[in-house]
From Swiss-Prot:
Cross-referenced Pfam families: H_PPase (PF03030)
Residues at the site labelled Important for ion transport: R214, D259, D266, D719, K730
Domain of life: Bacteria
Keyword field contains S-adenosyl-L-methionine: no
Enzyme Commission numbers on file: 7.1.3.1
Key words of the record: Calcium, Cell membrane, Hydrogen ion transport, Ion transport, Magnesium, Membrane, Metal-binding, Translocase, Transmembrane, Transmembrane helix, Transport
PANTHER family: K(+)-INSENSITIVE PYROPHOSPHATE-ENERGIZED PROTON PUMP
Protein name (Swiss-Prot/TrEMBL): K(+)-insensitive pyrophosphate-energized proton pump
Chain's gene name: hppA
Length: 801
């Protein structure tokens, strides 16, 4: 941070008014909009292919219908809750400074559009996933021949089931990239040079909804999962997804609202937020070209995602389903790199002096070729995605040493399993963070002495990574679909023998894809947040110039300087690091509280209905679904308020310099924490799978019980707290970007008003403290049986029949 005030300066002019959307660029953006619509058309084709498959037996259909009903009930209630919140934010955005009312109105309207698109992406993922899972199970059932029938071709059956699952993910991937690109291109077409400011609202809408879907879905899924495992596997000794466990339907619902809806919304907002930063910085660094080129790169990604999704066609020579998925990913990445190279050399000029609309004298006078900067920056993002995929796979796959070591540690008990998993998570966080950091720094160096070009290169690296998002979302959705398919098969009892083995193999591949995509999602979040950090710096520079102040150099006010040696900035840095820990703790505590209620409800049903164990009585699945729904929605408020109000409190209390340090602290700590939580949880999960496959005693052994405990600890790590850090970073950066002009306005110049600053800061702090206090007052102990029973009695048993 201190280095940002030395050779890289903002003292030269950065007026952006000269950049315009030329007629040629307008045509290009319109074509990009058509490409986005084409992605939605392809999604429609894939939906028809998936739904054309058979649904299996009546028992399988009944279980699938229960999962569908529970998922719809949860998301419906969540959307109603978030709808009220979105309307409030819509009007609050109108109060923030803007050049004119047209900009203010556009920012607020596109906030709602961003929120709607994010919710649509998540809902679409959930809607199709809960319909395709039974079709995957039905396809696998074909592997077991009926009496008198010849043996089936297991490879062909496995490939059919896998294709259904991956095409489901392809639909979600196409919606993610299609809606993200459509929203951004529409803003550019309507607002032209003002588009970056309006896109801030679009990005905030996408980010807020994604964070709530991530946190809420994560709490729901892991409360049900942990509760089901503790009572079912550990206490009752019954298998996973056993129909006698009242939490199994809620567990399957959670897979969809957490992994499908949550991840889709998460990557959609990464898409939107990265485009926001790239257009803001591109307008300053590349002038007229900067309003179109950041859209060209992800448009190429849409086309290559289509190729990658259809390239995932299993072959007989493949060692596993993962081979086909890796092939699709790398085909998409290679095609993206090649097409971006063509686009760069066709679209961009060969000299910085030929970039129209750039008023920064230093950029116009710079030697070198802007095409090289653009090409290398995008390549860094694409290569980073591939490296993160391999690194995450190393620490989480069952065939690699880290997971095998955790599996071996199960021979000495649960404590050593937990310790080994923590060790793997901590170590993997270092390597992943260094890899992401090198990627960001490598892109930054491309700018030379120009801070604006350096920051734009970081944003372009983010757009390069986004070229793989379509396939990444497909890979992630594949996981819960295959997991749910296995659950439906086990609960129905209609898929046995070879068919059950097909689903077991698919589930193992799905666990790996989920772990890998979490790593890449973290990388996209960090690059997006880093690019937004650059946009934030540009915003405070512009705001400071408007009130006649300088950001750096002699005479610059202390709390405008991005200098870590200043006490207020150091406090901001520490606060940014601390908020990540608080956010993670709140998320894990929420799972613990909800899981406690689930545990006591499932225990109550086993105690009061002994016929459940011999199948003479039916568990009340709906009660557990409703407990998870109510708890997840109740727990949303505190993390959400923390993410939005903490930057406001820091900014209005300590100034924009400290707020910049706060963002830097959050990005650094958030990167390490997110990777640690995701990889340790993924490693514990696959260590359990390793033992269940027959190693170290297999199912029912003491080693298996130890790995179940490790997996239970890892569940809220990898599926609640870890993934929720991604949108947290982007929400805080966007809030800082939006409030920066207001902080400067009330701190300097004619509108300086200390009273307003203090009032806003105190109000924000009081709300945060109050929300955390209320959250902490709720019982955290799993043994709080009275609290669990109160929750149980208030549950509505009619959610799922």
């Amino acid at each position: 941070m201190a280095g940002l005030s030395t050779p890289h300066q903002f003292d030269h002019p950065t007026a952006l008014a000269a950049a315009v959307l030329t007629d040629d660029n307008r045509v290009i953006v319109m074509v990009i909009g058509v490409v986005a619509l084409a992605a939605l058309v392809v999604a429609g084709i894939l939906v028809r292919q998936v739904l054309a498959a058979g649904e299996g037996t009546d028992s399988m259909k009944k279980i699938a219908a229960a999962v569908q009903e529970g998922a719809n009930a949860y998301l419906g209630r969540q959307m109603r809750t978030l709808g009220v919140f979105a309307v409030v934010v819509f009007f609050l955005l109108m109060l923030l400074p803007a050049d004119d009312w047209n900009q203010r109105a556009g920012r607020s309207v596109f906030f709602l559009i961003g929120a709607l698109f994010s919710a649509t992406t998540g809902y679409t993922g959930m809607w199709l996933a809960v319909r395709s899972n039974v079709r995957v199970a039905a396809a696998a059932r074909e592997a077991t021949p009926a009496e008198g029938e010849p043996e089936k071709d297991l490879t062909a059956v496995s490939h059919k089931a896998m294709k259904i699952a991956f095409r489901t993910g392809g639909v979600v991937g196409m919606f993610t990239v299609g809606l993200g690109l459509l929203g951004a291109s529409c803003v550019v077409l309507v607002y032209a040079a003002d588009a970056p400011k309006v896109l801030e609202g679009f990005g905030l809408g996408a980010a807020l909804i994604a964070m709530f879907m991530r946190v809420g879905g994560g709490i729901f899924t892991k409360a049900a999962d942990v509760g089901a495992d503790l009572v079912g596997k550990v206490e009752q000794g019954i298998p996973e997804d056993d129909p006698r466990n009242a939490a199994t339907i809620a567990d399957n619902v959670g897979d969809n609202v957490g992994d499908c809806a949550g991840m889709a919304a998460d990557l959609f907002e990464s898409y939107a937020v990265t485009l926001v930063a790239a257009l803001i910085l591109g307008k300053a660094a590349f002038g007229d070209s900067g309003l179109a080129f950041p859209l060209i790169v992800p448009a190429i990604g849409v086309l290559t995602a289509m190729i990658g999704i259809f390239a995932v066609a299993p072959r007989r020579a493949d060692r596993s389903g993962m081979s086909a998925i890796n092939r699709g990913f790398f085909v998409s990445a290679v095609f993206s790199l090649a097409l971006v190279a063509v686009a760069v050399y066709v679209y961009l000029p060969g000299k910085y002096a030929d970039l129209d609309g750039v008023t920064d004298v230093a950029i116009r006078a710079k030697d070198g070729d802007p095409r090289i900067l653009a090409m290398v920056a995008v390549a860094i993002g694409i290569v980073l995605a591939a490296l993160i995929q391999q690194l995450t796979g190393y620490f989480t796959e069952t065939t690699r040493r880290p997971v095998r070591d955790i599996g071996k540690s199960s021979l000495t008990g649960a404590a050593t399993v937990v310790l080994a998993g923590i060790s793997v998570g901590l170590e993997s966080a270092v390597y992943t963070a260094l890899l992401i950091g090198l990627g960001v720094y490598g892109a930054f160096l491309l700018g030379g002495t120009s801070i604006m070009l350096a920051l734009f290169a970081v944003a372009l690296a983010g757009t390069g990574l986004l070229t793989t998002v379509g396939v990444i979302v497909a890979m992630d959705t594949f996981g819960p679909v295959s997991d749910n398919a296995q659950g439906i098969a086990e609960m129905s009892g209609d898929v046995t023998g070879a068919g059950a083995q097909v689903l077991t193999d698919l589930d193992a591949v799905g666990n790996t894809t989920k772990a890998i995509t979490k790593g890449i999602a973290i990388a996209t979040a960090v690059l997006a947040a880093s690019a937004l950090f650059g946009s934030y710096r540009d915003a405070i520079t512009t705001a400071a110039n408007d009130v006649g102040e300088k950001v750096s150099g002699a005479g610059a006010p202390m709390n405008l300087m991005m200098d870590i040696s200043q006490p207020n900035n150091l406090v901001g840095l520490i606060a940014g690091a601390a908020v990540v820990f608080l956010f993670s703790g709140l998320a894990i505590n929420a799972v613990s509280r909800s899981a406690g209620a689930v545990v006591y409800e499932v225990r109550r049903q086993f105690r009061e209905h002994p016929g459940i164990m011999d199948y003479t009585e039916q568990p009340e699945y709906g009660r557990v679904v409703d407990i998870c729904t109510k708890d997840a929605l109740r727990e949303l408020a505190t993390p959400g308020l923390l993410a939005v109000l903490a930057p406001i409190a820091i900014g209005f209390t300590l100034g924009v310099g400290a707020l910049g340090a706060y963002l830097a602290g959050a990005i650094g700590t958030g990167t390490l924490m997110a990777v640690f939580l995701a990889n340790s949880g993924g490693a514990w999960d696959n260590a359990k799978k390793l033992v269940e496959d027959g190693h170290h005693g297999g199912k029912g052994s003491e080693a298996h019980a130890a790995t179940v405990i490790g997996d239970t600890v890892g569940d809220p790590f990898k599926d609640t707290a870890g993934p929720a850090i991604n949108p947290l970073l982007k929400v805080m950066n966007l809030v800082a970007l939006l409030i920066a002009p207001a902080v400067v306005k009330f701190s300097y110049g004619e509108d300086k008003n200390l009273g307003v600053r203090i009032a806003i800061a105190v109000l924000s702090i009081l709300v945060i403290v109050g929300a955390v206090y209320i959250s902490k007052r709720r019982g955290i102990a799993v043994g709080d049986e009275g609290n669990a029973e109160r929750v149980t009695k208030s549950a509505d048993p009619a959610v799922v029949s």
